[in-house]
Structure formats: C-alpha cells, structure tokens
C-alpha cells in the first residue's frame, strides 16, 4: 500500500527563513506523489520508504524496522543543506498483501518510476527484503543491462526458503537472473553458517570479511570494488545496518558486537557513490524500537547526507 509523504515528519531548527546558506533539509524538501511526478531531465535525489518488516518476522528476527523510514526522515531533516541538490520525498510503501513478494513487486513498480526521475534514488527500509524489491525495480528500469549488486552486510542473506524473507534477497536474485552478480563486504564469519559459505563458493559470490576491513581498506580491496563495477552496466548498492558495530547502531534487527565503524562504511561507499553506473542506494534494518538516542537513524541520515553532498 502506497502512502504519500507526511509533511509533519519534516521539522527542525530554523536558523533563518530567508538565507539559504543557513537552511536545513526540512526547509527545502519537496513532497511528491510518485504516480504523478514526471520530469523532463533527471535531477536531484528521490527518497522512497519501505515501511515493511514482514520479511524480518519471516526470518525470525526482531520486528520494528517498519518504523525505520520515518525515523530516518526526522533525523535527516535537521541536517544542513551544503550544496544545491534538490531532494524529493515520495512517501512509503506498507505491507498489506497476503504475501511479501506482492509488496516487493508494488514497491519495485514505484521505485522504477523514481529511477527515471533522479540521478540517485535512496530507498529506506524496513527489512533487508527491500534489496529484492530494489533489484526488481532495477530490472524493470534496465531490462537488458547487466546488474552488479554490491552489499555492505554482516550476512550473505542467501538463505534458502519457500518465500521471500529478509534473509533470502540475494539468493533470489542470483537464481532468477543470469545477468546479475553479487559482491558483499563485511561478512561476519561466526554469523554465517558453513552452508552459506559453501553456497557462496558454488555461485562464485565475491565477498570480503569484516576482519579484512575492520581497521582500514587495503588497495587490493579497493581494486576489487572497482573491477566489479567495471564489469557491469549498472550498479545497485545496498547497506544493511547490522554490519555496523552496535556501539554506533544499536537499533537494528540483528545487532553486531564486532561490526564495522561508520568511517569504514563511508570509505567503502565512496568507491561506489558518485560512479556514473550507480542507479540506486538502499539502507535497511533500522529498527527504532531498539534504538538509543536515535543513534541508528541519525547514522543512516548522515550516510544519506554524505551521499548527496
């Protein structure tokens, strides 16, 4: 179920009502109906929320991520506008279908429209089943292109299941599309079963463990990212917030006790964000029910701010 953006979410400190150099994003955000918005030339950044945690529930995780998109909006709205980049809020999609895949399909239809309007599209979850919806949107928008999927995540999310969950997205992509590849950074060895590592070997999944990038990113790993991007026509980028150490991101569905720092994630992201092949970015698993001082939502908002500016 699609709902347009809620203007009440966009509030914050006002330093000036006339001097644009003192504006914050809540003062410049544009609220749009995605079904009625069509632009002549791609511009700015679009935001579409995936207010869904049914996939987390089906994956036996702790629910609450459906509140993630609005928590991120509230945090992002009070951040400063540093460059003249328009940002459009298209609202949220909610789960009201019998099956999760139907909600993912609905989200994909709307996200694909957004891709046509903006240089970058920012998709905010919600559970990491947003990644399969993101992929479906990419395939709708680019039916004949090779898609490179880059995921910063503690988990492979290649579980085998009878239906979509927050832990199946990338298996669904790989087994349904010979023209898509998967590269994941931040894998926690103790949090993925041997069968998942075996599946990665079988499918030729490229991955980098958290231990390899815990303190710095070597030139070899930077080269791996660059080579992966160069091999594909378009890039889909997704971040699961459970890859972040719980000291920085306690409000997630599956917190990490030895995760990555925000600085490492931003450095990894800089290899990807800004590349002309990048089409969409998603950030998943922000769970306000377990957050502390809105720390996780603020971190996602900071990521978005860095990606835009």
Curated annotation (Swiss-Prot):
Chain residues that bind Mn(2+) 2: 153, 155, 240, 242
Cofactor binding note from Swiss-Prot or TrEMBL: Binds 2 manganese ions per subunit.
Ranges in coiled-coil conformation: none
Reactions catalysed, as given in the entry: N-formimidoyl-L-glutamate + H2O = formamide + L-glutamate
EC number: 3.5.3.8
Keywords: Histidine metabolism, Hydrolase, Manganese, Metal-binding
Pfam families per the UniProt record, alphabetical: Arginase
SUPFAM superfamilies tied to this protein: Arginase/deacetylase
Needed co-factor(s): Mn(2+)
Molecular functions per Gene Ontology: agmatinase activity; formimidoylglutamase activity; manganese ion binding
Positions annotated to bind Mn(2+) 1: 128, 153, 157, 240
The protein's annotated pathway: Amino-acid degradation; L-histidine degradation into L-glutamate; L-glutamate from N-formimidoyl-L-glutamate (hydrolase route): step 1/1
Enzyme class, broadest EC rank: hydrolase
GO term, biological process aspect, one: L-histidine catabolic process to glutamate and formate
InterPro entries, sorted: HutG, Ureohydrolase, Ureohydrolase_dom_sf
Family note: Belongs to the arginase family.
Biological function: Catalyzes the conversion of N-formimidoyl-L-glutamate to L-glutamate and formamide.
Protein name: Formimidoylglutamase
Organism: Staphylococcus carnosus (strain TM300)
